[in-house]
């Protein structure tokens, strides 16, 4: 097999746009252009790059299913058979006093609502007790070519493939028992579950305005799955395929082609190669509703409406801390509820 079959290539127009967004050109390109025009151009550039990334993934996926990619193994190091596990990761360690305020809040909520699951919290040191990655992965982490955010994409897949369970990002807030949610998500049908984009979502413009980098219902958009929350049985076909394809990517690349390249991979797999493995679609705006109200005045009735829809909530730690918590807001309510 020719090596270029599994190499990624960027959109040429996207590359030019990326250069123009750097010094010194950005002072002319960005600052002098009307904001609305600049935004439209960036959106178009993003869709062009998504298409280029999808085509690169297609070449790798085809080589993978034809048996032309190198077999790269990850080794589990524990026997956890029969145990229901919530997996979480925070690279620098889980000493509570050193965690960001939002992570502290989510930490306590997971402990409260774990139900019949046990929580295994991993960091850069103790993860080695559970999973062994190829040396090239660890080298890329050490030399900085793979950031911890994208390493965690690999870690979640490896753990779920080897042991099964539930992956929760450290910024996931729970307001109900996890076991109750796993039943409603229909995990038993496909053996895994992730929230996905739904064409029947209401208030699409609201969500696109809230986070235009992630939310879009444009037909060109290929970012349509949330990987912050993953339920999976051990040895699930989809999770295993995602893991092997991501390992193939990192074996041959040292730079991500798009922040959501994992999501683009999943979109290609379920759209073209493994449509029968697509899990139940549950709207990926649902885990974001609570955070969209985070700094608004707290309402018991509104909270009830939100938690009736989902008990799993995606928060963010960026720019959010007790220091800027607004009194009587939803954030203030949860800080007091969990004594953070």
Which residue stretches match the model-derived regions?
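Glycosyltransferase-associated regions of secretory-pathway enzymes
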Residues: 1-152, 170-340
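Small-residue hinge/turn detector
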Residues: 153-163
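Active-site acidic Asp-centered loop
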Residues: 163, 168-170
């Amino acid at each position: 097999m020719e090596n270029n079959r599994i190499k990624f290539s960027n959109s040429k127009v996207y590359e030019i746009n990326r250069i123009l967004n750097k010094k010194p050109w950005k002072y002319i390109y960005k600052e002098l252009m009307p904001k609305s025009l600049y935004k439209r151009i960036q959106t178009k550039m993003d869709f062009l790059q998504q298409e280029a990334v999808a085509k690169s993934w297609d070449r790798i996926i085809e080589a993978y299913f034809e048996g032309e990619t190198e077999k790269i193994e990850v080794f589990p190091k524990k026997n956890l058979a029969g145990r229901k596990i919530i997996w979480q990761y925070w690279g620098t360690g889980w000493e509570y006093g050193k965690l960001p305020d939002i992570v502290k809040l989510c930490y306590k909520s997971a402990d409260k609502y774990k139900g019949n699951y046990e929580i295994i919290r991993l960091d850069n040191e103790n993860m080695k007790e559970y999973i062994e990655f190829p040396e090239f992965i660890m080298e890329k982490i050490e030399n900085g070519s793979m950031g911890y955010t994208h390493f965690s994409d690999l870690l979640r897949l490896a753990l779920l493939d080897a042991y099964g369970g539930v992956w929760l990002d450290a910024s996931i807030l729970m307001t109900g028992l996890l076991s109750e949610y796993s039943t409603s998500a229909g995990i038993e049908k496909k053996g895994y579950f992730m929230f996905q984009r739904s064409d029947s979502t209401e208030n699409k413009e609201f969500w696109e305005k809230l986070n235009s980098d992630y939310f879009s219902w444009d037909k060109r958009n290929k970012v349509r799955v949330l990987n912050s929350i993953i339920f999976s049985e051990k040895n699930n076909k989809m999770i295993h395929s995602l893991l092997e394809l991501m390992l193939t990517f990192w074996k041959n690349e040292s730079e991500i082609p798009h922040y959501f390249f994992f999501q683009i991979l999943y979109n290609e797999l379920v759209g073209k190669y493994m449509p029968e493995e697509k899990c139940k679609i549950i709207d990926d705006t649902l885990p974001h509703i609570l955070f969209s109200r985070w700094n608004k005045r707290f309402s018991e009735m509104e909270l009830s409406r939100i938690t009736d829809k989902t008990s799993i909530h995606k928060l963010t730690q960026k720019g959010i801390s007790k220091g800027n918590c607004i009194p009587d807001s939803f954030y203030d309510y949860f800080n007091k509820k969990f004594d953070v």
